[in-house]
């Protein structure tokens, strides 16, 4: 028995609530198996009062999306002086903003795709850049709201400027990078293996590919040239450090090897709250390094701190 009381924060009120519940449930059960005293908290607007009364030794942040990974819950935990997992206030807020995170990563020497930051209503009926391109909400995760505009489309999709759009006014319009989906995790100062994601029946690594069993396969370590492998690892660690991440992060990449095995590698984004569901990438990447799911979670709990 470790004796540590761990509050697992899950659920919340973002569009990623179902993912968070899946992550939190898996993490809580495994931490109990490891000997921790676990309290499951389905986060609502009164979470600060709940945590202040509970006084756990550590908060395991299994939240995803706004409030959970944008610096908000991190600020609550800092104020309450409860050590917590993953990145701190500033790094979380920065990583959640895809545009600003890209600029910081690029300034540190990481290769990124050309992009524009726009209000979605500015797009209208004219292409903001030559297709193909991708439109992404600036502050969403799990591929919510991602729209791929193909070369043969004469106008941007109407959904972007319609009333049905629920992902905020700011969008990132980014050059579409063809090729393979690759990802790389960082655990503290240790860069992990590179993993290839192969969506099954999907154009890209969308919500279903991420969370539906059998909708994607993970090849870890990825079957790519050693120099490309090392380049991706270097870029993942550079982005992790430049943005100020702590604990575990995961960077996503596109590798265009259509014309050469030594093709272009582009960093897409960093995730400071990577999923911990049964189909998630980080547990698979850790497993390839000989680290079990339980060992990974224990490391995260012991790594928890304030002033992150």
UniProtKB/Swiss-Prot annotation:
It is an enzyme of class 6 (ligase). GO terms for molecular function: ATP binding; D-alanine-D-alanine ligase activity; metal ion binding. The keyword Nucleotide-binding applies. Binds 2 magnesium or manganese ions per subunit. It is found in: Cytoplasm. InterPro entries: ATP-grasp, ATP_grasp_subdomain_1, D-Ala_lig_Van_CS, D_ala_D_ala, Dala_Dala_lig_C, Dala_Dala_lig_N, PreATP-grasp_dom_sf. Keywords: ATP-binding, Cell shape, Cell wall biogenesis/degradation, Cytoplasm, Ligase, Magnesium, Manganese, Metal-binding, Nucleotide-binding, Peptidoglycan synthesis. One of its GO terms (cellular component) is cytoplasm. Mg(2+) 2 binds at residues 269, 271. Mg(2+) 1 binds at residues 252, 269. HAMAP family: Dala_Dala_lig. Belongs to the D-alanine--D-alanine ligase family. Cell wall formation. This is D-alanine--D-alanine ligase. It comes from Brucella anthropi (strain ATCC 49188 / DSM 6882 / CCUG 24695 / JCM 21032 / LMG 3331 / NBRC 15819 / NCTC 12168 / Alc 37) (Ochrobactrum anthropi). The lineage of its organism: Bacteria, Pseudomonadati, Pseudomonadota, Alphaproteobacteria, Hyphomicrobiales. The gene is ddl.
């Amino acid at each position: 028995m470790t004796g540590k009381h761990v509050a697992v924060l899950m659920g919340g009120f973002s569009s990623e609530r179902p993912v968070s519940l899946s992550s939190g449930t898996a993490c809580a059960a495994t931490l109990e198996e490891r000997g921790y005293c676990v309290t499951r908290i389905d986060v609502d607007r009164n979470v600060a009062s709940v945590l202040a009364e509970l006084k756990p030794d550590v908060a395991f942040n299994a939240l995803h999306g706004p409030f959970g990974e944008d610096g908000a819950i991190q600020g609550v935990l800092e104020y309450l002086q409860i050590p917590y997992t993953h990145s701190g206030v500033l790094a979380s807020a920065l990583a959640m903003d895809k545009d600003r995170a890209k600029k910081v990563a690029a300034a540190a020497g990481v290769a990124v795709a050309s992009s524009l930051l726009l209000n979605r209503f500015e797009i209208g009926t004219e292409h903001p850049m030559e297709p193909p391109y991708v439109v992404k909400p600036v502050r969403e995760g799990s591929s919510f709201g991602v729209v791929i505009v193909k070369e043969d489309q004469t106008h941007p999709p109407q959904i972007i400027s319609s009333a049905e759009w629920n992902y905020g006014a700011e969008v990132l319009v980014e050059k579409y990078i063809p090729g393979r989906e690759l990802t790389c995790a960082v655990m503290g100062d240790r860069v992990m293996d590179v993993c290839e994601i192969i969506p099954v029946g999907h154009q890209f690594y969308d919500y279903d590919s991420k969370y539906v069993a059998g909708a994607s396969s993970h090849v870890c370590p990825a079957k790519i040239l050693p120099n490309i492998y090392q380049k991706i690892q270097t870029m993942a660690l550079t982005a992790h450090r430049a943005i100020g991440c702590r604990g575990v992060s995961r960077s996503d990449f596109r590798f265009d090897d259509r014309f050469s095995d030594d093709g272009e590698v582009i960093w897409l984004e960093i995730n400071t709250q990577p999923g911990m569901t049964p189909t998630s990438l980080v547990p698979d990447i850790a497993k390839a390094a000989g680290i079990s799911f339980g060992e990974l979670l224990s490391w995260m709990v012991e790594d928890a701190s304030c002033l992150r």
